[in-house]
Amino acid sequence: SAVVSNIDINNYTHKPPVPFNLTGLQKEASSQFNINPKTTQSIAQDLYEVSLISYPRTESQKLPPKIGYKNILKKLKNQENYTEKEKKVLKKDKHDNLYTQQGKKEDDAHPAIYPTGQNPGNLSKNERKIYDLIVKRFFAVFGKAAKRQTLTMTLEVNGYTFNAKSKV
């Protein structure tokens, strides 16, 4: 039988993600969908050219309020895949003080990548994936920090030591 020799509980907060710059979008698309960076850049450029997203070749991780958060969110409300997410963001702050998580990198010429709110219509499978990543990240940057916990247990079994770790 095992004996628990130590339990360590660590509480912490996990901040919302920062807005996408091109590199961040490429990493996420590769991780989530195995889409290579060159293809991601090409798809993002195509989405930009039909006014679905902002300029994609940016290094900025900042979304200035002047882009009109609330207006974009209202437009996204009309897209069937995002209605509930949009409502949650708008309910978050009833005083029109929407706050976004901001990254460190800034590009004076262009803000981070964001959806324009225009209806995407028919997109290819990969275009839809990239567009969804951008929209979902846009929603996520308005989130509150999540409360997380790490639990580490040390177990002793027949003279052997085992560590078990769990994140909640």
What are these regions (language model features)?
Residues 1-168:
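Core catalytic DNA strand-manipulation module of type IA topoisomerases
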